């Protein structure tokens, strides 16, 4: 008999194969803290990230994710300029003070103002001279009844009795000034009357409406973006950094390669302050390799996604629960966060992933059906769905994700070897409704386990391995479901 012990490296488990064991608890679900690490130096207020997929995350999803306390990762199936523009859109969507507001020169025309307002979803634009000195402001009210697109902006802007405030004005004082003058935008100027920023009443209001929004030190929403491993990786990173991105993900199907680390080192050497996440991996060796190379976080998941066919096409993969367990153990004490990417089907899988050692989870299919996703809306047999596809599908690869699967040199579409499919998911309404259920399930799981915060759940969570009968017992059984729950379907 041929020895084979060294060929079988272990048993692989999925989230369905285990359950968290309840423990003594002195804490209620509403009392737990779910703040966690996204990278070495970036924290997020909920441990949920939206995937860098072209039917999941563009600027609208990234804005909504940050407002709910998480973060969105903009996909890279677009030009460098388009991706950088989406980063800017997120950074300008909400801010304590907009430090780099959209402006127009004195030579601008009405058509320019209309285009900017539509492009950036804003209602007012400061007008400055070539030295940056404030000369006026044009708002949507100034343009509402203006039909001459070629009219100079200086003829319609407000230039007299401008309400301004000095650099350093607090949000509380700014709110008072806005209310006193019954205006919506406060122009911030320096001692030389140069425009230094803009505070809007809408942004002040959002601070109270979304108290756990994930923001940078300037009060802007945080956003991440994906880059690839081809020749434009550094150029793409440069454009994203200039646009204000908080972190980038070197996004490939197999992160444990020499080429990926080469890109990581190039990006790090050019932008030493930029947080760089690397994925995807599934083993302890890969985790240590990337951490030693300077990765600020690693992303775990080879083939667990609902639209991924890597495991059946290539015969390669690692059941997700075991992969997270192994990678987290290898990186314990290193300060490198673990992102569990894929395989999350129910809210209960989130506390399982975290107890296995993940710092946060990345979601694709569970978010693809929300209103904020860029996927196409479909009506099928009287029900509303949204399109959802893997980045390894032929359709996505044609749009630019070939390099993720190391097929960027293949120009003939018929010769691509896809590792994903195209499908649809039920429409789920606005993102905040889904996030509420995800967070609620996580809090409930932490309460059952007596974990006051994410680190405690990671350190003390224990599991029991269950059988197929145990899986069946876990789901509703011996009954016909007559009304759908907001957080459960089979």
Question: Model regions: which residues?
Answer:
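Alpha/beta catalytic cores of nucleotide-metabolism and tRNA/nucleoside-modifying enzymes
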Residues: 1-24, 104, 166, 173-176, ...
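Catalytic beta/alpha-barrel core
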Residues: 74-77, 103-104, 124-126, 164-165, ...
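Active-site-adjacent beta->alpha loops and helix N-cap segments on the catalytic face
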Residues: 30, 79-88, 146-150, 194-214, ...
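Short beta-strand/loop segments at the ligand-binding rim of alpha/beta enzyme cores
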Residues: 43-48, 96-101, 160, 216-226, ...
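Terminal amphipathic helices with adjacent charged low-complexity linkers/tails
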Residues: 76-90, 127, 131-147, 178, ...
